């Protein structure tokens, strides 16, 4: 059953709202995936804060027109699942991880920072650590010298106390 005009307008408005806040869009072909597997993928996407939906390509073309993602329109052919995320890495990571365990999901393309990415580009983007991981590594690197200095001072103080006693 097809969508009527009002439903189509609502879908375009919903997708446009998601795209307005997005940094990354990744598209993949989902031919032959079982419903249970697709449900697992949707759950992982929800947990990662990724908008994941199977949509008509023409509606998505309208939603991304006049945005940084408009160049993806050339890749919108066939049965596709769209992954949209405000986190630059999350959308690519969710689909790429799922594609590793399910060979029926084929990554097609993606767009990040106004550039269209091919399958290899999407996989490279997925391999980048998330923002939280990068911040925790940066914090560790910044804390390590200070923590070492404090331990050295504590050891020096303990040594002087022993010498004084």
From Swiss-Prot:
Its job: Forms part of the ribosomal stalk, playing a central role in the interaction of the ribosome with GTP-bound translation factors.
Keyword Ribosomal protein: yes
Record has Ribonucleoprotein as a keyword: yes
Oligomeric and partner information: Part of the ribosomal stalk of the 50S ribosomal subunit. The N-terminus interacts with L11 and the large rRNA to form the base of the stalk. The C-terminus forms an elongated spine to which L12 dimers bind in a sequential fashion forming a multimeric L10(L12)X complex.
Annotated transmembrane regions: none
Biological source species: Dechloromonas aromatica (strain RCB)
GO BP: translation
Domain of life: Bacteria
Gene Ontology CC entries for this record: ribonucleoprotein complex; ribosome
Alphabetical list of HAMAP family matching this protein: Ribosomal_uL10
UniProt keyword annotations, A-Z: Ribonucleoprotein, Ribosomal protein, RNA-binding, rRNA-binding
InterPro entries: Ribosomal_uL10, Ribosomal_uL10-like_sf, Ribosomal_uL10_bac, Ribosomal_uL10_bac_type
SUPFAM superfamilies, per the entry: Ribosomal protein L10-like
Family, similarity comment: Belongs to the universal ribosomal protein uL10 family.
One MF annotation (Gene Ontology) recorded for this entry: large ribosomal subunit rRNA binding
Name used for this protein in its record: Large ribosomal subunit protein uL10
């Amino acid at each position: 059953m097809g969508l009527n005009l009002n439903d189509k307008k609502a879908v375009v408005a919903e997708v446009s709202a998601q795209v307005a806040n997005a940094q990354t869009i990744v598209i993949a072909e989902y031919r032959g995936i079982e419903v249970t597997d697709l449900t697992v993928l949707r759950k992982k996407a929800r947990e990662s804060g990724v908008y994941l939906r199977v949509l008509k390509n023409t509606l998505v073309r309208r939603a991304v027109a006049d945005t940084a993602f408009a160049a993806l329109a050339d890749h919108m052919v066939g049965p596709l699942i769209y992954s949209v995320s405000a986190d630059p890495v999350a959308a690519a990571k969710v689909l790429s991880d799922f594609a590793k365990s399910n060979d029926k999901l084929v990554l097609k393309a993606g767009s990040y920072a106004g550039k269209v990415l091919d399958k290899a580009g999407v996989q490279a983007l997925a391999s980048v650590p998330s923002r939280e991981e990068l911040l925790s590594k940066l914090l560790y690197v910044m804390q390590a010298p200070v923590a070492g200095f404090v331990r050295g001072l504590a050891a020096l103080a303990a040594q002087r106390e022993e010498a004084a006693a």
